[in-house]
Amino acid sequence: MNTQVINQVKQYVTQRAIFIVLILLVIGIAIADPNFLAFSTLRDILQQSSTRAIIALGAAFILVTGGVDLSAGRVVGLTAVVSASMLQIDEYANRFFPDLPHLWVGFPIIIGIVAGLIVGLVNGIIVAKLHVPPFIATLGTMVAVYGLNSIYFDTEPNQSQPIGGLRSDFTVIGSGYIDLGGGYSIPYIVLIAIAVALICWVVFNKTRLGKNMYAIGGNIQAAHVSGIHVARNLIALYAIAGALYGLGGVLEAARTGGATNNYGNMYELDAIAACVVGGVSTAGGIGTVPGVMAGVLIFGVINYGLTFIGVSPYWQLIIKGLIIVAAVAFDIRKYMAKK
């Protein structure tokens, strides 16, 4: 009986480990500085984590299939630049397009999302039709997209000046909020991230595409045998991921009020790390939307919280690296135990 209880406790802790870690992180930082629990601090963490969450959700679609997408960060940079270049105020001295008429704010946003979707389609076709390993395929598109973005931006790599002077009807999406009264508010960008997460949850759990995604990641040969059109599903999943990266890039430009062709650098690694820490298996076939969101929040708490209490950025990198290694090791251990 005692053994059964112990096993049940172990299973409970294992299944909820990511949320336990998040709670412990918040408690630990709050002990070091009680001001960390102020509502404004938690709101800032959520606001800064929102775009990362959308990008991580895109990466999760690919990881669950057993693949990996290294192009995410550069797609974010491309879509941030494209949308920002079309949404500068008319009076700004250094307008990217001096003669561009005043556009409806939604048009460049749609253009950015579609640009991301197109890159995702290209990734999907290369992986599904040409049978190039996802790591190599997306590494190639990562470099190509950065080159394309630099050509569009018309500058040498690593020598860019930000596109500034963005219109307020665009930046309000990233920095505006709904006032709840009493000193409380919810940023628009947080609500957008929650809406995207809910849609992704539906796709993961309530659609044929989601079921096929798990089947492909669990055993691609078995998926073929069971009649799943693997290539078609992979292309669709990569396209969805690209669209999410595109949305993330647009929102990041709105949040920060500018963009350069170096935007999004290393975002793909942060997204993959958040997914893995959130329980998405590197072997494929396993992963949940709540887990991904928790993984993003863990890194949000680490980035903001450790800076809040004065921890060196270099120590923050070490801590993040150790968390990633521990998460992957734990994932591999579970995978080997099942085998």
For each predicted feature, which ranges?
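Cytosolic-side transmembrane-helix boundaries in multi-pass membrane proteins
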Residues: M1-L25, V225-R232, I302-K339
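Membrane-interfacial amphipathic/re-entrant helices at transmembrane-helix boundaries
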Residues: M1-A56, E91-F107
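Transmembrane alpha-helical segments in multi-pass inner-membrane proteins
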Residues: Y238-A239, Y245-G246, R255-G321
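Transmembrane helix-bundle core of multi-pass membrane transporters
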Residues: F135-K206, N233-A236, T256-G264
